[in-house]
Amino acid sequence: MGVFVILLHLNKIKMKKIKVLLGLFIISASLSGQTRSFGEKIEEGSIIENSKIQNLFLAKEKFNAKLKAKVTDVCQMKGCWMKLEIGDEKDIMVNFKDYSFFVPKNIIGKEVIVSGEAFKRNISVDELKHYARDRGENESVISLIVEPKEIYSLTAKGVILLP
């Protein structure tokens, strides 16, 4: 009789654990379809179309921008930068204002909305190599980086990760 009571008690404990785990699973599944924000809140307003953003880079030295784009690369060390595709095989390198926030490292292929100051800049060989290491490139690939490059850049105040 005592063994039966012990087994019954153990089954009740297991059922409680299963119910808790099931509840956590349901909560996490419901949250996965929501947007996630990083940094400052992005204000309502118009988003610059990707087809127009390149013209702004050509026409202005610096400008405030809010755009929606697909993430093509993310720092695999801590999520401290990302690249966004804007069409015509062009990317924007996004850093985060004062390194005050980071993004998840597993968002390549996801869409984001970013808001911040956009500008063109020359990036040194050392910095290009640093970013290659952050991406996890091997030294044979890194050794091929021998020239600085002009890039489109954006210092983001805020990021919204879309579902």
Can you describe what each PLM-predicted range is?
Residues 1-37:
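Bacterial Sec-dependent N-terminal signal peptides
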Residues 34-163:
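OB-fold and OB-like single-stranded nucleic-acid-recognition modules
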